[in-house]
């Protein structure tokens, strides 16, 4: 009962705060605040530099693979389990999924820099 009450109060509080932020007007939204600032001088170069979408996709792919490989880290401790065939099958399944997803990325040319 206490957990449900705390969860409901936290959810209502979060919703209330989100509604308040959408209803409040943007204070002092004049043009001077949205200009780039370089120590009081005019900017030397444009502040909005274009970002490479290819780099972004490779970085996201790297993060996903890095997190999936982190799932393999507890394997040395899992070797002490009594159900060894299940542990081996689950780790092989994870490695096969990693290999297939890497092959898919490679075939879709998601890892190529030049285009």
UniProtKB/Swiss-Prot annotation:
Q: What is its main location?
A: mitochondrion
The EC category is translocase
What biological process terms from GO does the record include? aerobic respiration; cellular response to glucocorticoid stimulus; mitochondrial electron transport, NADH to ubiquinone; proton motive force-driven mitochondrial ATP synthesis; response to light intensity; response to oxidative stress
Catalysed reaction(s) here are: a ubiquinone + NADH + 5 H(+)(in) = a ubiquinol + NAD(+) + 4 H(+)(out)
* Source domain of life: Eukaryota
Q: Which UniProt keyword terms apply here?
A: Disease variant, Electron transport, Leigh syndrome, Membrane, Mitochondrion, Mitochondrion inner membrane, NAD, Primary mitochondrial disease, Respiratory chain, Translocase, Transmembrane, Transmembrane helix, Transport, Ubiquinone
State what changing residue 47 to T does: In LS and MC1DM1
Residues in a coiled coil are none
Bilayer-spanning residue ranges? 3-23, 55-75, 84-104
Q: Which disease is it linked to?
A: Leigh syndrome: An early-onset progressive neurodegenerative disorder characterized by the presence of focal, bilateral lesions in one or more areas of the central nervous system including the brainstem, thalamus, basal ganglia, cerebellum and spinal cord. Clinical features depend on which areas of the central nervous system are involved and include subacute onset of psychomotor retardation, hypotonia, ataxia, weakness, vision loss, eye movement abnormalities, seizures, and dysphagia.
Protein name (Swiss-Prot/TrEMBL): NADH-ubiquinone oxidoreductase chain 3
Q: Name the encoding gene, please.
A: MT-ND3
């Amino acid at each position: 009962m206490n957990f449900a009450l705390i969860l409901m109060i936290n959810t209502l509080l979060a919703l209330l705060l989100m509604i308040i932020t959408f209803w409040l007007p943007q204070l002092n939204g004049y043009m001077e605040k949205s200009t780039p600032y370089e120590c009081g001088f005019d900017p030397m170069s444009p502040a909005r530099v274009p970002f490479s979408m290819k780099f972004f996709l490779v970085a996201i792919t790297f993060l996903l693979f890095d997190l999936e490989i982190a799932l393999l880290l507890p394997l040395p401790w899992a070797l002490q389990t009594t159900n060894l065939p299940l542990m081996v099958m689950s780790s092989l399944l994870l490695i096969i999924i990693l290999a297939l997803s890497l092959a898919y990325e490679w075939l879709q040319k998601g890892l190529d820099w030049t285009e």
